[in-house]
Amino acid sequence: MSLHSPFGPNALLRRLSLLIVIVALMAGCHPDAGAALPNQAAAGKDEVDPVDQAALAQALNALQPQRPGVTDLYVVGFAGDASDDVFRNETLYLRQLFEQRFAARGRVVTLVNNPDNLGEQPYAPLATYDNLYDTLAAIGKRMDRKEDALLLFVTTHGTEDHTLYVQVDQNEEDFISPQDLRQALDDAGIGSRIIVLSACYSGGFIPALRSPDTLILTAARADRPSFGCGNTSNATYFGQAWLIDAMNRSDDPLAAFDMARTAITAREQQEGELPSLPQQSLGKRIAPVLARWRAGLQAGAAVAYPYPPLETAPDAGQDQDPEADPDSKSLDDPTKVKVPAAPASPRKPAPVPAPATP
């Protein structure tokens, strides 16, 4: 089932391309890519999911208005592929980090695809193009175009032809092009933009998204994969380096990117990976907005990453005594994971002949 409504005359082409994407993912960055996911039996073709729409309405109604004279940062996280927990992990951590360290509480929306976010009591709206479009539109109505800024963080698989892969469950799949993303941002009337894309080949989004009011940070060059997706990792290489490590050391997204690029280069060299070559594009008008935001910000303490490395995580079938540690919480609820004392780097995923779409 396609989630993406504004197909226009290219609907058939999108469907055919989607089949190619799915095949590529199944042969791509990790052995679990494209694994079967739960089927939402109640959701028919092109039907609106009332549970998801209620979750979206609740999230958007909770958004706080902008404050005159203050450069407010609105934050949107998008975990696109439900088959990999790393995308959910990073997106929920994005909320924790920006609410606690960067004083963005009331101005953060997370859209998440994961099997644990399906059902009658989701903890976040689903990560679909329509939900992203509506979220950006709602933020555009609340923010001051000349004063405030948006940070959009997307973490998912990317394709060689420069699309972002979206999978809610086995019947709901889509992909988002650079033009789709630009249209959603432009239609929302959002001025100052910080766009962070953690996906393979994400540098291919830069030409369509570039503007004087935009900072773009990508995990890879247009012709390169990035690494760390899969169910053997708790974070992608880029998510670990930029979001988890560098943004806890700096309040400057661009300075954090420079730190992350250095760390990723060293890690890829050490592990023998093809360099992903993260990219950035800085518009001439976005830098003063970032400077104003940072000047009015008193950054809080570093926020620990709450998802333990998988090599030390409890076995799925292992029984645990809940009274052994009264402060521990079930890993089944990603919003209530016990924060480890010192989060470590994710384990390198199993090598594959040609990683194509992490």
Regions found by a protein language model. Name each.
Residues 3-17:
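Bacterial N-terminal signal peptides that target proteins for export
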Residues 12-15, 29-148, 233, 292-323, ...:
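Boundary/activation segment at the start of structured domains
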Residues 16-28:
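Bacterial N-terminal signal peptides
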Residues 58, 89-93, 97, 127, ...:
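Extracytoplasmic/secreted proteins, especially bacterial periplasmic and envelope-associated proteins
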Residues 71-74, 104-108, 145-150, 188-193, ...:
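Loop/turn elements at helix/coil->beta-strand transitions in domains of secreted/extracellular proteins
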Residues 81-84, 113-118, 156-162, 170, ...:
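Solvent-exposed loop/turn segments at secondary-structure junctions
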Residues 156-187:
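A short, glycine/acidic-enriched catalytic loop
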Residues 199-284:
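Active-site-proximal C-terminal subdomain of hydrolase catalytic domains
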